[in-house]
């Protein structure tokens, strides 16, 4: 009599179970490798290790009587279309997707100072903060501190050039997508709020202008308006329209004071 354990159906079942276990193990191993690579990638970018880009914008002299404004930052600036419509004001978009504040330093001369702007509007820092919340980063505070130091650098450098600076509050984040839940800790919102407080202090102590955009993204003091977002980090046309309104009120007053 043959044991049922060795029956064709049983052997097929055992093979199927072993194959699925092997597949599960392989998927787990690949996930850990991907997680490790992603962690290294985010850490190195936060430190500015790797390649850097520039916008390759051609220099154009401002017509007499016109104010030149450079929008400087990451994808949140790159997606900032259209810019505010202000009489006698031209805007140059110097935003590059994914950049940290350290990476932005490499192109600061080429993409900002070279244009000899009257005003610079900065929206930056979120990519440093998402690097800091990446699972596996050993010292998240190190990356946050570097970002704060970089923001002080921009404030000081533009002040030395007698260029007016408007630092906008770092836009908040919306709900994490499923992939981001796998790779990011949940402290991003708090880190953005804390960093905004610190950057606001830098701006006020150095004579720069800080534009708090909380009212664009919050229905009241705490309820985030998710209708202003297209994904976890990026905002939609309605949000940009509200930001443009705020800048349209602020920038002319800065132009008149020059």
Where are these regions (language model features)?
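Conserved SGNH/GDSL esterase-like catalytic core that processes O-acyl groups on lipids
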Residues: 39-152
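Generic detection of intrinsically disordered/low-complexity segments and helix-coil linkers/edges
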Residues: 23, 35-37, 53, 74, ...
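Short, well-ordered helical secondary-structure segments
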Residues: 6-8, 19, 59-60, 64, ...
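Alpha-helical cap/lid subdomain in secreted, periplasmic
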Residues: 5-6, 11, 84, 106-258
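N-terminal secretory targeting modules
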Residues: 1-70, 252-254, 258
């Amino acid at each position: 009599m043959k044991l049922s354990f060795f029956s064709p159906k049983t052997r097929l079942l055992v093979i199927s179970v072993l194959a699925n276990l092997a597949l599960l193990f392989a998927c787990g191993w690949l996930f850990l490798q991907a997680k490790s690579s992603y962690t290294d990638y985010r850490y190195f970018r936060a430190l500015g290790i790797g390649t850097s880009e520039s916008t390759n914008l051609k220099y154009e002299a401002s017509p007499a009587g016109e104010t030149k404004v450079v929008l400087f930052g990451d994808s949140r600036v790159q997606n900032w279309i259209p810019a505010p419509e202000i009489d006698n004001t031209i805007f140059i978009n110097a935003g590059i997707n994914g950049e940290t504040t350290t990476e932005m330093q490499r192109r600061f001369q080429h993409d900002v100072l070279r244009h000899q702007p009257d005003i610079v509007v900065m929206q930056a820092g979120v990519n440093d903060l998402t690097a800091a919340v990446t699972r596996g980063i050993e010292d998240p505070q190190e990356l946050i501190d570097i970002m704060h130091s970089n923001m002080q650098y921009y404030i000081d450098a533009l002040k030395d050039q007698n260029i007016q600076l408007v630092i906008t509050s770092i836009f908040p984040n919306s709900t994490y997508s499923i992939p981001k839940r796998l790779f990011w800790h949940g402290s991003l919102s708090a880190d953005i709020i804390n960093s905004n407080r610190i950057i606001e202090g830098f701006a006020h102590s150095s004579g720069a202008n800080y534009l708090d955009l909380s009212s664009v993204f919050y229905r009241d003091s705490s309820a985030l308006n998710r209708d202003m977002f297209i994904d976890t980090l990026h905002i939609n046309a309605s949000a940009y329209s509200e930001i443009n309104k705020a800048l349209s009120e602020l920038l002319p007053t800065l132009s008149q004071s020059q």
